[in-house]
Amino acid sequence: MKSTAESKETPSQDESTTSVPCTEAPLVEEGEEASFGAYKRIFTFAGRTELILQAVAILAACASGAGIALQNLIFGQFVTVITDFTNGISTPADFRDNAAELALYFVYLGIARLVLSYTYNTLLTYAAYRIVRNIRHAYLKAALSQEVAYYDFGSGGSIAAQATSNGKLIQAGASDKIGLLFQGLAAFVTAFIIAFVVQWKLTLICICIPVATIGTTGVVAAVEAGHETRILQIHAQANSFAEGILAGVKAVHAFGMRDSLVRKFDEYLVEAHKVGKKISPLLGLLFSAEYTIIYLGYGLAFWQGIHMFGRGEIGTAGDIFTVLLSVVIASINLTLLAPYSIEFSRAASAAAQLFRLIDRESEINPYGKEGLEPERVLGDVELENVTFSYPTRPGITVLDNFSLKVPAGKVTALVGQSGSGKSTIVGLLERWYNPTSGAIRLDGNLISELNVGWLRRNVRLVQQEPVLFQGSVFDNIRYGLVGTPWENASREEQMERVQEAAKLAYAHEFISELTDGYDTLIGERGGLLSGGQKQRVAIARSVVSQPKVLLLDEATSALDPHAETIVQKALDKAAEGRTTIVIAHKLATIRKADNIVVMSKGHIVEQGTHESLIAKDGVYAGLVKIQNLAVNASAHDNVNEEGEGEDVALLEVTETAVTRYPTSIRGRMNSIKDRDDYENHKHMDMLAALAYLVRECPELKWAYLVVLLGCLGGCAMYPGQAILMSRVVEVFTLSGDAMLDKGDFYASMLIVLAAGCLICYLAVGYATNTIAQHLSHWFRRLILHDMLRQDIQFFDREENTTGALVSRIDSYPHAILELMGYNIALVVIAVLQVVTCGILAIAFSWKLGLVVVFGGIPPLVGAGMVRIRVDSRLDRQTSKKYGTSSSIASEAVNAIRTVSSLAIEETVLRRYTEELDHAVSSSVKPMAATMICFGLTQCIEYWFQALGFWYGCRLVSLGETSMYSFFVAFLSVFFAGQASAQLFQWSTSITKGINATNYIAWLHQLQPTVRETPENHDKGPGSGAPIAMDNVRFSYPLRPDAPILKGVNLKINKGQFIAFVGSSGCGKSTMIAMLERFYDPTTGSITIDASTLTDINPISYRNIVALVQQEPTLFQGTIRDNISLGVFNPNTQPFFSDKDAVKSVSDEQIESALRAANAWDFVSSLPQGIYTPAGSGGSQLSGGQRQRIAIARALIRDPKILLLDEATSALDTESEKIVQKALEGAARDGDRLTVAVAHRLSTIKDANVICVFFGGKIAEMGTHQELIVRGGLYRRMCEAQALD
């Protein structure tokens, strides 16, 4: 029969609510195209200082650009000097003196360019750092201010990854590229002004060049911006999906889900790749049109100039040469607009995506200052006729005309089935949501009229699945003091309060035993603590501020019986004088409540005290009977609050000596630890990185061939110009028809050059984007796949938080896209042009060529390579620093309910901003140093042009080279300098691409310890039993000095049901991790069917094992998808295959598994049934519903070994009873071996063997009856949970 209560869905209180769409199709919504309005808005985030810096920088860039154009005047005078010498007007000595004087102007220009280019690059880059910092700050502030429903809808994308990756795109488009743009525009304008002054008629003809070029660039950039925006949207949702996968990496390993999930991730990438392919013809058009238009205009100008000269409209050849050189300079700088326009387009698209969230007004804004803040809080809570449906499912009513009065200072308990609305009341009291109708009051005031921050600071919450933040234990508990008078107290005062709260939560003792006590770092989401330890720290965090209203949503669900009893007493004490609302499935924890409210279907079924409800013999009494344990307590067996008894004390004495490992073992542990450290990796240089990228995708050979041929054709542009312009000078020595005929011929040659540019750059633009999009797709998929291959200890490392990893998944492939797109073509063309121009110079005038090429090119290239090397180191450092800020953002947004309930939005934002400020400040000095190298790359060309001009004229005057040869050689050197200067304008993209390639290559070759190898490929686990543990000792790899298991000996036979019980942190869950082979023993061994576990193929072994975790992990997708992921299919294809084992699971199998987990009733009652989206992390389901889906996923696997780590901790009493029967049946199904960790002893009392852990060892072992008779630790645990 269907349970109607279950149809009233309660979205989870789980924290993994970041933002994947609730629906499965379409993959992304169509977004609005980013406009350059978004680009302009970027600069509204600049402060006064940044605006001043930008203004100074732009002036410097314009001056630098003017300097580029002023060389045309020098060239004009140079032609006059040449003409005078050729015509015999000046002597060789005068010729050399005049040449030396003109050469000095080049030296001065070089010095000016050095100062100006250094100035504008440094100032603009620093200003961009600050602007992007402000945008990221505003973005995270907006994210933290959104109401919880925003995340329920999956509206956010991966917020942390977007803040980092989109910030990098904005940085790229709002820093030095602006200076290069203004420099180019200034050079273009100045060159045309010079040309107008010299010969206005001829210059007017050349106006067609910029008009056509800018028009083409504008149209293409607008269309391309729309595609870029769409790609960013798809990648944002792909990143969010990846975030959910990485957050649940243990489940991925346990069930072998990697290939299926990566394939699902790839569906997003395929969609993005389709859009990316549409950019290829646009880039082909953009580059080919620019160069073609320029050379067509150039040919037209030369043809017209010759004819005007022949008609006497132009007086001297020098004027034509000055105009033509001005057109060349203007054209060269105009061609740079194309790649810059793409950078600006990407920056605009990235900014527009961030601005959408920044502009969104939250319905419940925690930053708001409005609302009442009463001076005194009594704690009277009243819900009056409250009706509520979650925004994601408006058709399902969770609370229906619900009314409840909670008197001040009293304890009110809420019990009932999962999905009955208990946790919904908590969400409404915390103002995560507003009721659909009805009123909620605190001390008579509508909570909607109270200040949100004030309300949450006075109504504290401990959640069912507590979330801690990266940092120390002290930091986490101190968060509870935010917004109180003790927030800014001294550390000593805060520590005193923190310790008092920890003692109240029965956490002080275990915290004191940690390596660094309260300063011990606990890892991402508190991952280095056990579930019970995390829960106690969360309780301490909530009570440290001494709130007037306390909400406990299954606050003791993860505690062992002894700790639960003590903590419950502490909570009972803490509840004195304050209003407490308790949600509990363990009825022992609420029997002393002043009022127990039994809920079902959003209504109150019955309420009263424990005694009155027992006497009524109704629903509550039935639940109590289910949980009672058969223990006859005696007076002397009462729970001892101070210790576990004498037997425990003896154990402690024996354990103190076992704390160190032999040197060889420690050496092995350190080597494994160092292996996962990227900083120890030897980095590839640029050529090796490029070679790796080419080798990685051999299917792109055709595209690389097209690019190479196109680059070879494109590199002929500058040498061709040098030869043609040298011939132009010869034309002016002729007269009459001969001059016009030669002029027409060379003008037609420029048209041929334009045609060649059209073909070459069309091919290059199309092929490079094809390569870039393919590599981006491939490496996004590969980097996630390779991350999921790694051992669990890889994810335990501080630098490998979920947020940091997702940021790398997004930013590194994009860096490769930038490198291997048009940038690599421009770099290759520039390199080939330097080489060909150098060869041409040496060929026509070997003395001049050798002196200038080997005197000027090496220092220029050297300065550029030094910049790339320094820039690469800086990029690695800043990426690491920004990774820290990304981790803060990721954990805050993933834990949005915890952040909001603690009202610590400002604190999180301050931490995030401090990390951003640290990243900016620490980058300034090395960035300023790299800019010196950049300045040198921009000025050295002028210095070797000066050398070439002076030495070349000297050779001409001495008759050692002809005038034509000198012109060819000198112009070749001039164009080589232009090419080399352009080459290093893209050094930032080069360094980022090289660093990204290095990380991806390192990760790809990094082999996990737990993997399939040729040696173990055919070694299976046999029958899966017996399992024997021989003196197993274990310390987590990152905490070698903190032993968890201290010599465990155990044998589990086929078909047995074994239970592990004991206090939190004693090693129970670690045993499960050992059996799942998340880690290997530090010393000792585990054997399966007489084979050592480390010698068995881990894939084959895990195929016979199923795991249900204490905090179940679900992934974005439907309920069906999540259960299907539990099925092992021996024919599963690798991730790059289109086949998927998940699709082969029948609906009948799904239904059978759901029925076994007591989940079929609630699933079948949903409108979409098994095709209902579970949401990111299962956020659309309640905790109990998620747990049952996880159990169904384990049961559908039909495992030989079933591992249950608090598998029923989130279930209500009735569901637990049914599911427990199913699990017991599953445990006795055939020869299945079952290992269960449990704090609810009623769930394991029928186990064949119960192992009581204490201090990393098995203290007691036996059946339930045997251990009760023995009267030790286990008996006292049972007494703590007895209800009668």
UniProtKB/Swiss-Prot annotation:
<feature type="domain" description="ABC transporter 1">
    <location>
        <begin position="381"/>
        <end position="626"/>
    </location>
</feature>
<keyword id="KW-0812">Transmembrane</keyword>
<keyword id="KW-0677">Repeat</keyword>
<dbReference type="Pfam" id="PF00664">
    <property type="entry name" value="ABC_membrane"/>
</dbReference>
<feature type="glycosylation site" description="N-linked (GlcNAc...) asparagine">
    <location>
        <position position="401"/>
    </location>
</feature>
<feature type="glycosylation site" description="N-linked (GlcNAc...) asparagine">
    <location>
        <position position="995"/>
    </location>
</feature>
<keyword id="KW-0325">Glycoprotein</keyword>
<dbReference type="GO" id="GO:0016887">
    <property type="term" value="F:ATP hydrolysis activity"/>
</dbReference>
<feature type="transmembrane region" description="Helical">
    <location>
        <begin position="824"/>
        <end position="844"/>
    </location>
</feature>
<feature type="transmembrane region" description="Helical">
    <location>
        <begin position="99"/>
        <end position="119"/>
    </location>
</feature>
<keyword id="KW-0067">ATP-binding</keyword>
<keyword id="KW-0547">Nucleotide-binding</keyword>
<feature type="binding site">
    <location>
        <begin position="416"/>
        <end position="423"/>
    </location>
    <ligand>
        <name>ATP</name>
    </ligand>
</feature>
<dbReference type="InterPro" id="IPR003593">
    <property type="entry name" value="AAA+_ATPase"/>
</dbReference>
<feature type="transmembrane region" description="Helical">
    <location>
        <begin position="320"/>
        <end position="340"/>
    </location>
</feature>
<feature type="transmembrane region" description="Helical">
    <location>
        <begin position="931"/>
        <end position="951"/>
    </location>
</feature>
<feature type="glycosylation site" description="N-linked (GlcNAc...) asparagine">
    <location>
        <position position="632"/>
    </location>
</feature>
<keyword id="KW-0813">Transport</keyword>
<dbReference type="InterPro" id="IPR017871">
    <property type="entry name" value="ABC_transporter-like_CS"/>
</dbReference>
<feature type="glycosylation site" description="N-linked (GlcNAc...) asparagine">
    <location>
        <position position="488"/>
    </location>
</feature>
<feature type="compositionally biased region" description="Basic and acidic residues">
    <location>
        <begin position="1"/>
        <end position="11"/>
    </location>
</feature>
<dbReference type="GO" id="GO:0016020">
    <property type="term" value="C:membrane"/>
</dbReference>
<feature type="glycosylation site" description="N-linked (GlcNAc...) asparagine">
    <location>
        <position position="800"/>
    </location>
</feature>
<dbReference type="GO" id="GO:0005524">
    <property type="term" value="F:ATP binding"/>
</dbReference>
<dbReference type="InterPro" id="IPR027417">
    <property type="entry name" value="P-loop_NTPase"/>
</dbReference>
<protein>
    <recommendedName>
        <fullName>ABC multidrug transporter atrC</fullName>
    </recommendedName>
</protein>
<feature type="glycosylation site" description="N-linked (GlcNAc...) asparagine">
    <location>
        <position position="385"/>
    </location>
</feature>
<dbReference type="InterPro" id="IPR011527">
    <property type="entry name" value="ABC1_TM_dom"/>
</dbReference>
<dbReference type="GO" id="GO:0042626">
    <property type="term" value="F:ATPase-coupled transmembrane transporter activity"/>
</dbReference>
<feature type="transmembrane region" description="Helical">
    <location>
        <begin position="178"/>
        <end position="198"/>
    </location>
</feature>
<dbReference type="GO" id="GO:0005886">
    <property type="term" value="C:plasma membrane"/>
</dbReference>
<feature type="domain" description="ABC transmembrane type-1 1">
    <location>
        <begin position="55"/>
        <end position="346"/>
    </location>
</feature>
<dbReference type="Pfam" id="PF00005">
    <property type="entry name" value="ABC_tran"/>
</dbReference>
<dbReference type="InterPro" id="IPR036640">
    <property type="entry name" value="ABC1_TM_sf"/>
</dbReference>
<feature type="domain" description="ABC transporter 2">
    <location>
        <begin position="1027"/>
        <end position="1280"/>
    </location>
</feature>
<keyword id="KW-1133">Transmembrane helix</keyword>
<comment type="function">
    <text>Pleiotropic ABC efflux transporter involved in the protection of the cells against a wide range of toxic compounds.</text>
</comment>
<keyword id="KW-1003">Cell membrane</keyword>
<feature type="transmembrane region" description="Helical">
    <location>
        <begin position="55"/>
        <end position="75"/>
    </location>
</feature>
<feature type="transmembrane region" description="Helical">
    <location>
        <begin position="846"/>
        <end position="866"/>
    </location>
</feature>
<dbReference type="GO" id="GO:0140359">
    <property type="term" value="F:ABC-type transporter activity"/>
</dbReference>
<feature type="glycosylation site" description="N-linked (GlcNAc...) asparagine">
    <location>
        <position position="1122"/>
    </location>
</feature>
